[in-house]
């Protein structure tokens, strides 16, 4: 469905991971893969401040000050990626974090999706994290999917073949950047 839920945001998943690790329900992760940006690009009315701050602006504030901010004070995508990733880096210092940009979608204007993906990629660069550019490299092409549904069921969500191909692609890309 095209409805947003707070359970889909990365921060809530991070909170659950931290809580589960603290309570012994989950071991400390060695690898954290964050796939983000699709809803940020898809729902501009619900997320009007997503592109309100550049990556450079999001990284102006020193870490010592930025780390004391609360989740509700980080509104732009660049600030959110910085906040979430630095929190994970602080709590799980031995885990490798890999960021995934969103795949192309017929439901999202290409320029908006690419702006979101570029923001995520630049944040990854600033944080020295590996980034997999699904918007550029995955099997899903919005232009092709507009003509015929090759790898998606609806122009956004992968079908069986799209999931299989993208799964192989992600496995290859992520295994190539593993640091252990």
Residue ranges and their predicted role:
Residues 25-28, 93, 125:
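Residue-level preference for short coil/turn positions at secondary-structure junctions
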Residues 22, 88-90, 178:
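N-terminal cationic-hydrophobic initiation segments that often serve targeting/anchoring roles
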Residues 103-180:
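Catalytic His-Asp segment of secreted/periplasmic serine-dependent ester chemistry enzymes
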Residues 1-75, 79, 157:
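Conserved SGNH/GDSL esterase-like catalytic core that processes O-acyl groups on lipids
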């Amino acid at each position: 469905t095209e409805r947003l839920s707070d359970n889909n945001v990365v921060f809530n998943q991070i909170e659950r991971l931290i809580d589960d690790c603290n309570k012994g329900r989950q071991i400390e992760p060695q690898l954290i893969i964050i796939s983000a940006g699709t809803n940020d690009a898809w729902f501009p009315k619900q997320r009007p401040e997503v592109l309100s701050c550049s990556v450079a602006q999001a990284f102006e504030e020193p870490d010592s000050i930025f780390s004391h901010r609360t989740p509700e004070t980080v509104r732009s995508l660049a600030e959110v990626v910085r906040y979430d990733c630095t929190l994970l880096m602080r709590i799980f210092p031995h885990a490798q974090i890999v960021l995934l940009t969103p795949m192309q979608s017929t439901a999202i204007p290409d320029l908006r999706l690419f702006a979101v993906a570029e923001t995520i990629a630049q944040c990854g660069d600033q944080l020295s994290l590996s980034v997999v550019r699904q918007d550029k490299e995955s099997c899903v092409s919005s232009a092709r999917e507009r003509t015929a549904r090759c790898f998606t069921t609806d122009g956004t969500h992968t079908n069986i073949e799209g999931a299989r191909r993208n799964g192989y692609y992600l496995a290859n890309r992520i295994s190539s950047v593993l640091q252990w």
